[in-house]
Amino acid sequence: MSAATARHILVKTREEAENIKKQIEGGSGFCELAKKLSKCPSGNKGGDLGSFSPGQMVKEFDQVVFNEEVNKVHGPVQTQFGFHLIKITSRD
């Protein structure tokens, strides 16, 4: 596996992440919610993190991106930065 692309939404609490995930499951757009609610600068780009290889992100993030189903929202995933909802957009 050489690279993946993903979007994410970063918030401070598990509860916030779970509430946002429910909104997405209810039909709200991932990109729009990332722009509105994410604490990461990538939120301005709809949570887009671009392309990255294994080892470029924190371990917990990599484990999801390089092992879980593409085009599905995963999480909340806890890292040192907070709680993430992760949408894997592609993986080679």
Language-model features and meaning:
Residues M1-L10, L37, E60-D92:
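Proteostasis/folding factors centered on peptidyl-prolyl cis-trans isomerases
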Residues Q23-E60:
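Peptidyl-prolyl cis-trans isomerase
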